[in-house]
């Protein structure tokens, strides 16, 4: 709550769609009014093997309230970096950010380089001694109408600019006539499948072009279309249903009048966890279409 009026960072953790649903009223109001300090909602995406709740995704909640959604590659340096990026993205766009951590991401081991602690610009004690209020932040008409326009005219473009300039999404591999777009959290599974096919090594060096979406919402049309240049086929690896990312990327291609053939659900199953075998079967099926000579 302090992040709304003050340059104070705040974070909270929820378990998947259950915790987000319980807090949905407060979260929707937070997303409407916007924030001054960085606000980060860390969500344990409880989907697939090991889950203890209904099989739903966080993605549609982020879309309906315009929370920017981070889905970092499952290694400790990437996850730690995503926390820093999430706070900075929130502050740059005055919008709360969701950081999604999948079940398997929570079981990785490794190491990461730490940073020195930094004193906050404003402490909670200092904020309490000089309380602020802004009636325009109240989520009631007519202010709520202004909030909606601010989202699409100011906050969204600011978020896209930050994501693009900071390079939050990543591209790996050489140029080629086909490529793969993958949610950041599914990157390890994809690399393992390519490794089993002899198209990647254990360090992640890939012979296939890969566009990694460490930010799955919002998607950047220009960045995606640049990745598609010179390609005939592109595969979207999107776990869970419905296929929000695939649909949006298809819209980008349609509006650009691109001839790139987009693959996704159909080659991959519509629902369920993308286990090692499912990932291998899906990538193999795509390569039979996009690169039969391989």
Tell what function each PLM region has.
Residues 73-294:
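Flexible, low-complexity linker and terminal segments
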Residues 1-91, 102:
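Thiamine diphosphate
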């Amino acid at each position: 709550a302090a992040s709304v009026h003050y340059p104070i960072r705040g974070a909270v953790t929820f378990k998947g769609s259950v915790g987000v649903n319980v807090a949905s009223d407060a979260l929707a109001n937070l997303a409407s009014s916007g924030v001054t300090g960085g606000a980060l909602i860390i969500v344990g995406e409880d989907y697939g093997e090991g889950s203890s709740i209904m099989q739903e995704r966080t993605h549609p909640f982020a879309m309906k309230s315009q929370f920017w959604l981070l889905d970092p590659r499952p290694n400790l340096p990437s996850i730690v970096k995503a926390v820093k990026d999430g706070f900075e993205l929130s502050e740059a766009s005055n919008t709360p950010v969701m950081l999604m951590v999948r079940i398997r991401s929570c079981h990785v081991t490794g190491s990461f380089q730490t940073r020195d602690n930094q004193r906050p610009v404003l402490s909670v004690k200092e904020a309490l001694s000089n309380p602020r209020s802004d009636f325009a932040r109240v989520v009631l008409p007519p202010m709520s109408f202004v909030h909606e326009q601010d989202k699409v005219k100011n906050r969204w473009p600011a978020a896209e600019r930050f994501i693009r300039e900071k390079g939050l999404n990543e591209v790996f591999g050489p140029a080629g006539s086909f490529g793969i777009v993958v949610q950041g959290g599914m990157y390890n599974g994809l690399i393992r499948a390519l490794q089993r096919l002899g198209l990647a090594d254990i360090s992640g060096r890939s012979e296939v072009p890969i566009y990694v979406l460490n930010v799955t919402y919002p998607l950047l049309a220009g960045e995606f279309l640049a990745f598609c240049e010179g390609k005939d086929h592109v595969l979207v690896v999107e776990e869970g249903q419905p296929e929000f990312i695939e649909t949006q990327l298809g819209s980008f291609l349609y509006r650009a009048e691109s001839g790139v053939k987009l693959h996704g659900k159909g080659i991959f199953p519509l629902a369920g966890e993308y286990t090692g075998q499912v990932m291998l079967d899906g990538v193999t099926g795509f390569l039979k279409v996009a690169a039969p000579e391989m």
